[in-house]
């Protein structure tokens, strides 16, 4: 019996109509719309044979009597439909009144629910409810025809459980409030049937669903030959609503209950509800009233409203006396205008009689004041509705603005976090590059020191070798074994030095590859403009290197080539020898010449070794320093580009 998803009933904005529509669907499901009060009386009389109001019924008894009821109302109804209706109604009654799951319910509660959900007229239901409450009172013979407070409270508590089955009981208030409103102004211990019927016709809040359910059931098959102003449906089936503010504007039941807006009509306008198709006289009177309301000047309109207020006050009791359902329409937002329309359609003769009283000045003055007060109240209510609508629109706009601002704030926070992470990554790369640069500088300094030590040791070895050669040139001092061992040690030292140079070159090559890899990683996270700047920088450096190489190829030979050429040229040696050769050739100075020649050879070897060692060291140092400067320039350019892009 979950009615939340039936026919989209939760889309109905007005809680009273939403509850009534759900109860109407439940009524059709249980086939109670086919049951009349005359069909209920034999079954109820059988159950009330004991005369006690606290009779408890088990589920089997209730199901048995309900099956007899449904078989009696429609003999041609299939057995399957009878069984289904019996089961649905039994489950409904026990869901309403057996909250503790005891397995039994009271007879009075069953009778109240069946009377409220049957398909009889509203006046017949009201009289049946009065007789049921009268049976609760247990009055003496002299008190027949009235009900007490306790009896009315019990009846209203049972009836208040009916909308609870569709989760709408929170809308209609409490039973004690309804009892107080019924006994308001009553000095006796009970109320009569006339007063009770009048109170029910005034539609107390607790029983609003009862009259609304009846109007919906009456108007289901009614077709109104007018167009809906909102959805353009023709004809309008069901309840029809005519706007009292807009001229010739009609709404169907669906558009009104969902508060559908249109270009001219607003949900805040006062409307009249029609259950059945009105006659042509009623239509003409309604059209004239709308035209007068829209076209008559302000002072004439005020006079017309005053007269209509007088007519409404005089014909308040005649609104519910007509048995024709066409006269049972009520105002939704403006009670006084609805009463005026009802009085015009119900008793036009009474209007003529009451209009004669306007000739009396003594009655006219208080009535005019009453009409003005009523008009002020209606204007105030309209202003309050407009303010509430403006408040609702402002709240909607504020919600939209807050969502937009929140989304923008979130996007900015995401961008800020991305920039922060990028800056942290770049700082880490920069620190890593600086560490590698320091490592390169340290290795260069160590290598320079090693080269200085090596050159110094080579110089010392050469000097030792020159001494050995001098000793070798002297007669009687030749030591072949010592000279060969010295040469062997020199070769081993040279080999170790070359291996150390190769290891250091491999280390420098690995460091350069790490630097290039880090630069590539850092370039992958840079923006497009930084990549472009670095590419341009690399192209310029490559062009400069190519131009330098081209100039070196076309220019003069390098120092190494000149040195190699001088070494290979015998004239260089002979020139040097000629500088130190003696002018005379005597036999006495033959030993001196030989010693001078050895010294010259030793000096030449020392000079050549120093020149070669210093030249190679200077060349390698220059190459490493050039590479280090290039790395430094690239790192500084990278950091500058990142800072400029982050600031932009």
From Swiss-Prot:
<feature type="compositionally biased region" description="Acidic residues">
    <location>
        <begin position="538"/>
        <end position="548"/>
    </location>
</feature>
<keyword id="KW-0175">Coiled coil</keyword>
<dbReference type="Pfam" id="PF09068">
    <property type="entry name" value="EF-hand_2"/>
</dbReference>
<feature type="region of interest" description="Disordered">
    <location>
        <begin position="536"/>
        <end position="557"/>
    </location>
</feature>
<dbReference type="InterPro" id="IPR000433">
    <property type="entry name" value="Znf_ZZ"/>
</dbReference>
<feature type="compositionally biased region" description="Polar residues">
    <location>
        <begin position="455"/>
        <end position="474"/>
    </location>
</feature>
<keyword id="KW-0472">Membrane</keyword>
<dbReference type="InterPro" id="IPR011992">
    <property type="entry name" value="EF-hand-dom_pair"/>
</dbReference>
<dbReference type="GO" id="GO:0005886">
    <property type="term" value="C:plasma membrane"/>
</dbReference>
<keyword id="KW-0863">Zinc-finger</keyword>
<feature type="binding site">
    <location>
        <position position="243"/>
    </location>
    <ligand>
        <name>Zn(2+) 2</name>
    </ligand>
</feature>
<feature type="region of interest" description="Disordered">
    <location>
        <begin position="455"/>
        <end position="509"/>
    </location>
</feature>
<feature type="compositionally biased region" description="Basic and acidic residues">
    <location>
        <begin position="479"/>
        <end position="502"/>
    </location>
</feature>
<feature type="binding site">
    <location>
        <position position="228"/>
    </location>
    <ligand>
        <name>Zn(2+) 1</name>
    </ligand>
</feature>
<keyword id="KW-1003">Cell membrane</keyword>
<dbReference type="GO" id="GO:0008270">
    <property type="term" value="F:zinc ion binding"/>
</dbReference>
<feature type="binding site">
    <location>
        <position position="252"/>
    </location>
    <ligand>
        <name>Zn(2+) 1</name>
    </ligand>
</feature>
<protein>
    <recommendedName>
        <fullName>Dystrotelin</fullName>
    </recommendedName>
</protein>
<feature type="binding site">
    <location>
        <position position="255"/>
    </location>
    <ligand>
        <name>Zn(2+) 1</name>
    </ligand>
</feature>
<keyword id="KW-0479">Metal-binding</keyword>
<keyword id="KW-0862">Zinc</keyword>
<dbReference type="GO" id="GO:0099536">
    <property type="term" value="P:synaptic signaling"/>
</dbReference>
<dbReference type="InterPro" id="IPR043145">
    <property type="entry name" value="Znf_ZZ_sf"/>
</dbReference>
<dbReference type="InterPro" id="IPR015153">
    <property type="entry name" value="EF-hand_dom_typ1"/>
</dbReference>
<feature type="binding site">
    <location>
        <position position="269"/>
    </location>
    <ligand>
        <name>Zn(2+) 2</name>
    </ligand>
</feature>
<feature type="zinc finger region" description="ZZ-type">
    <location>
        <begin position="223"/>
        <end position="279"/>
    </location>
</feature>
<dbReference type="GO" id="GO:0045202">
    <property type="term" value="C:synapse"/>
</dbReference>
<dbReference type="InterPro" id="IPR015154">
    <property type="entry name" value="EF-hand_dom_typ2"/>
</dbReference>
<feature type="coiled-coil region">
    <location>
        <begin position="367"/>
        <end position="446"/>
    </location>
</feature>
<dbReference type="Pfam" id="PF00569">
    <property type="entry name" value="ZZ"/>
</dbReference>
<feature type="binding site">
    <location>
        <position position="246"/>
    </location>
    <ligand>
        <name>Zn(2+) 2</name>
    </ligand>
</feature>
<dbReference type="Pfam" id="PF09069">
    <property type="entry name" value="EF-hand_3"/>
</dbReference>
<feature type="binding site">
    <location>
        <position position="231"/>
    </location>
    <ligand>
        <name>Zn(2+) 1</name>
    </ligand>
</feature>
<feature type="binding site">
    <location>
        <position position="265"/>
    </location>
    <ligand>
        <name>Zn(2+) 2</name>
    </ligand>
</feature>
<dbReference type="InterPro" id="IPR050774">
    <property type="entry name" value="KCMF1/Dystrophin"/>
</dbReference>
């Amino acid at each position: 019996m979950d009615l939340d998803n039936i026919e989209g009933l939760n889309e109905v904005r007005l809680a009273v109509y939403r509850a009534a529509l759900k109860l109407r669907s439940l009524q059709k499901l249980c086939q109670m719309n086919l049951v009349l009060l005359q069909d209920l009386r034999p079954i109820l009389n059988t159950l009330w044979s004991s005369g006690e109001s606290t009779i408890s019924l088990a589920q089997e008894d209730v199901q048995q009597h309900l099956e007899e009821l449904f078989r009696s109302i429609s003999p041609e109804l299939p057995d399957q439909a009878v069984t289904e209706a019996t089961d649905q109604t039994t489950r409904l009654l026990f869901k309403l009144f057996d909250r503790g799951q005891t397995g039994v319910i009271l007879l009075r509660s069953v009778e109240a629910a069946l009377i409220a959900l049957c398909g009889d007229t509203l006046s017949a239901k009201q009289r049946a409810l009065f007789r049921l409450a009268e049976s609760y009172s247990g009055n003496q013979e002299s008190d027949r025809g009235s009900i007490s407070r306790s009896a009315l409270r019990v009846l209203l508590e049972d009836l208040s459980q009916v909308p609870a089955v569709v989760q709408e009981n929170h809308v209609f208030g409490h039973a004690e409030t309804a009892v107080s409103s019924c006994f308001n102004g009553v000095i006796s211990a009970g109320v009569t049937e006339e007063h009770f019927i009048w109170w029910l016709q005034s539609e107390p809040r607790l029983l609003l669903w009862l009259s609304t359910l009846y109007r919906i059931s009456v108007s289901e098959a009614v077709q109104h030959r007018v167009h809906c102003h909102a959805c353009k449906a023709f004809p309008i089936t069901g309840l029809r609503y005519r706007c009292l503010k807009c001229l010739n504007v009609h709404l169907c039941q669906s558009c009104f209950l969902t508060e559908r807006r249109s270009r001219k009509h607003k949900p805040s306008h006062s409307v009249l509800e029609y259950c059945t198709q009105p006659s042509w006289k009623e239509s003409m009177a309604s059209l004239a009233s709308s035209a007068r309301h829209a076209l008559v000047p302000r002072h004439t309109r005020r006079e017309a409203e005053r007269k209509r207020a007088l007519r409404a006050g005089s014909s308040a009791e005649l609104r519910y006396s007509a048995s024709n359902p066409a006269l049972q329409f009520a105002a939704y937002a403006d009670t006084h205008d609805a009463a005026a329309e009802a009085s015009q359609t119900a008793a036009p003769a009474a209007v003529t009689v009451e209009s004669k009283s306007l000739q009396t000045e003594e009655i006219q003055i208080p009535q005019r004041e009453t009409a003005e007060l009523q008009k002020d109240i209606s204007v105030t209510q309209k202003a309050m509705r407009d303010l509430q609508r403006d408040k609702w629109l402002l709240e909607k706009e504020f919600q939209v603005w807050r969502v937009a601002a929140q989304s923008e704030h979130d996007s900015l926070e995401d961008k800020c976090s991305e920039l922060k992470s990028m800056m942290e990554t770049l700082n880490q790369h920069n620190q890593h590059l600086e560490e590698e640069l320091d490592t390169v500088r340290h290795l260069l300094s160590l290598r320079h020191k090693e080269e200085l030590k090596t050159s110094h040791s080579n110089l010392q070895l050469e000097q030792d070798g020159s001494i050995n050669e001098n000793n070798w040139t002297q007669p009687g001092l030749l030591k072949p074994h010592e000279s060969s061992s010295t040469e062997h040690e020199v070769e081993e030292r040279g080999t170790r030095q070359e291996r150390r140079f190769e290891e250091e070159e491999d280390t420098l090559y690995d460091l350069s590859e790490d630097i290039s890899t880090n630069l590539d990683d850092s370039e992958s996270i840079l923006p497009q403009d930084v990549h472009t700047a670095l590419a341009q920088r690399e192209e310029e450096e490559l062009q400069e290197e190519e131009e330098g190489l081209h100039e070196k190829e076309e220019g003069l030979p390098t120092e190494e080539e000149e040195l190699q050429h001088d070494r290979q040229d015998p004239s260089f040696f002979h020139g040097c020898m000629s500088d130190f050769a003696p002018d005379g050739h005597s036999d006495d100075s033959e030993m001196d010449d030989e010693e001078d020649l050895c010294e010259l050879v030793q000096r030449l070897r020392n000079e050549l070794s120093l020149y070669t060692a210093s030249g190679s060291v200077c060349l390698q140092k220059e190459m490493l320093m050039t590479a280090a400067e290039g790395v430094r320039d690239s790192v500084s350019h990278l950091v500058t580009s990142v800072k400029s892009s982050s600031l932009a």
